[in-house]
């Protein structure tokens, strides 16, 4: 029961931080049953050089199923289960073993599958001569652990060069099998594909499944082919950090966009890399970014340590970490040191006592308590390196992907439950705003879910229809985008819908119609930057815009 139970206390702490009522959290906690384990797919091609494709399915399906509201199990946790059961990394489990693995990880569903690749003319599927025309055929099944029932086969196929589309299509079908109420469009899933060249994706997948020099080489190759590839940047930065090349790690990790879902993990390791390079201000900034979005106690603690290393007071941050997880003796120890630096000897004594109650064998805490007993009340800590007493706050160096993702998942559940209690119009407004935020981050399936929820709450919401129009445009569905924009404008004139139509008409070379829509948008909002920029584009093509 490792997966769901280990991080329950920090999640409760997060609920307290966001001031959600216990009833809201209880309802969210009861909406479980969405934990998914994706296993590597079996290669039926007879070509071992294509095994990497099987390893790629957990990576892609985890991303897409997470966007559909499922909690997917990471590569590291899957490996933990294999190690715990004494299974090799490349083990292909039977159904009985699969169930044992799923039970070890508290999974409700397991995704299993296979694929075959038919080479195109001119070479094998894995060679440059035939890869472009090779075809991949995929079959997946969903094993429900709760019902002990296997689904019917789920099939898809595509040219091998369109592997992302094939994997996303399979993910969309799988989501529908696990959740009959799942309503995101397939086109939205296809539009969410990473714009990564297939060779870079191959190097990335081979890299994350390799060790040592081979791992580093593959990840560097992936980044050299796709310099803005967030997944490859994260894994390369983590590998550089593990190799203690902290400057290189910091440079690499800083390139992961702040809007990407991987930014939290990237900035956690960026903070550690900066900390180990004694760039404490940089470390503070990185940890602060993570804490602002997911204030787990280990992140707040690390931010506090970075602040303290700069000679600044960090009591409030350490107290926040300790309050969030009072069972962690390190947080009490750190708070005790910070209080001692401030001159609060009574508070420091209280906190170090709490640390020793949790771990009586902590020699550093025992020494700190002894020093506190020697000094007068109100004395400020002045590290005495001559006699060896120079206590330092402890930083957390391990990022738990499971803990972070579990906390983020539960917060989403809490937020959804809170929104469900609002009046319909207010609910629609908040869902629409969330949809726009997701859309701005390129998270198309997540955005569609929010816009759909907004329209369920208020079917006549012009803003929600306008948001859906933007989504359809972004996912490559111009007809759907046009329909949604027109529907939005029937309900209320608005700039967003008008600009969607203007861009669509511009793409169709209907410059007159595009100009009219831009004019209407500027009448509603004369200073709208997007409308002004689009006006210049249309004018440069010889069309007058009034």
Task: Give the positions of each predicted feature.
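C-terminal/domain-edge helix-coil "capping" segments
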Residues: 26-34, 59, 68-71, 97, ...
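Short coil turns that delineate tetratricopeptide repeat
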Residues: 227, 261, 294-295, 326, ...
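Short beta-strand->alpha-helix linker/helix-N-cap micro-motif
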Residues: 28-100, 104-129, 145-153, 189-196
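Structural signature of tandem alpha-helical TPR/SEL1-like repeats
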Residues: 210-217, 242-255, 276-289, 307-320, ...
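Alpha-helical segment of the N-proximal tetratricopeptide repeat
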Residues: 196-231, 235-245, 400-403, 426-453
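Canonical tetratricopeptide repeat
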Residues: 235, 269, 302-303, 334, ...
